[in-house]
Amino acid sequence: MAATEQNLRSTLKVGLEALQLQLSEQQINQLLAYQAMIAKWTQVYNLTSVRDPAEMMTHHLLDSLAAVPALQRYLHRSGLEQGSRLLDVGSGAGLPGVVIAICCPQVAVTCVDTVAKKAAFIKQAALALRLPNLTGLHARVESITESFDVICSRAFASLADFTKWSAGALAPQGVWMAMKGKHPADELLALPENIAMFHVEQLKVPGLDAERCILWLRPVS
């Protein structure tokens, strides 16, 4: 039986409580509306291979939400709580970029993807969900000349490729936030000497029995 909106709302609220993430009712409604948009667009444009609403909630929304507290802590420690800029590389359906834009309205989020339809979806989501802090960009990340305080990716590419391709968009004191499954020891070994991991966090995604982690990286001289 397909999950009803009430079931999804309940799963989301339980997940938010487990993550100790306090959101307003408006933000919860935006997250649910966003998932409904993904489901609708996926019927035509295949934004994601996950079609079941309950699975989409755990594998996409809650998986992305699990990274938000870590991002908020970093922004707080770095004095970037207001006016910071985040780039989500290979954003696809906007995961985690749109989720971050909903949860962190003070962060200007740009989601970049090389697939035009996916970038168009982000632009539509920004309008439909009334997110003035969200921008969709159809481009290769290597071509971006603006600078960002945080550059993130979720299951996008190897750490070496992710950092190499996006280095031109990193602000002088900027960092990379890479969302991964299992701790990618081999990928870390393949990083060039001028990029260092300075923090790693294990994530527990509510309702998902799988390994998840965030790796924080920055350039070193």
From Swiss-Prot:
Its main location: cytoplasm. Its EC number is 2.1.1.170. Disulfide bonds: none annotated. It holds the Pfam family GidB. It comes from the Bacteria. It is found in: Cytoplasm. InterPro entries: rRNA_ssu_MeTfrase_G, SAM-dependent_MTases_sf. The keyword 4Fe-4S does not apply. SUPFAM superfamilies: S-adenosyl-L-methionine-dependent methyltransferases. It catalyses: guanosine(527) in 16S rRNA + S-adenosyl-L-methionine = N(7)-methylguanosine(527) in 16S rRNA + S-adenosyl-L-homocysteine. S-adenosyl-L-methionine binds at G90, L95, V141, E142, R154. GO terms for molecular function: rRNA (guanine-N7-)-methyltransferase activity. GO terms for cellular component: cytosol. Keywords: Cytoplasm, Methyltransferase, rRNA processing, S-adenosyl-L-methionine, Transferase. HAMAP family: 16SrRNA_methyltr_G. Belongs to the methyltransferase superfamily. RNA methyltransferase RsmG family. Specifically methylates the N7 position of guanine in position 527 of 16S rRNA. PANTHER family: S-ADENOSYL-L-METHIONINE-DEPENDENT METHYLTRANSFERASES SUPERFAMILY PROTEIN (PTHR31760:SF0). This is Ribosomal RNA small subunit methyltransferase G. It comes from Polaromonas naphthalenivorans (strain CJ2).
